């Protein structure tokens, strides 16, 4: 039985390369990322939260939901191909609901 996977996305910010993109290039990047997310079967589990006011490391965070681990892997491979990591600095943590986690 496959388990839903959740990914906490901690966004540090954008690289200088991102700020060099034109508005059309930025739109194209986010369109590609959106298609990757849709194709992978992922969805936003929460809105995006502004957290810059509360720390000096992250500007925002959100949570993604995947039907299974393979979907999460497809999403990561797809955004890599779309070159998102060239433009955004982030950290992610994958997990499952505690009720679904393996016993220790």
Regions from the language model: what does each represent?
Residues 1-58, 66-74, 95-104:
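Short S/T/G/P-rich N-terminal loop/turn motif that feeds into the first structured element of a domain
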Residues 62:
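Conserved, mostly hydrophobic/aromatic
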Residues 74-82:
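Short amphipathic alpha-helices in soluble, non-transmembrane regions
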Residues 84-96:
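Conserved short beta-strand edge segments in small beta-sheet-based binding/regulatory domains
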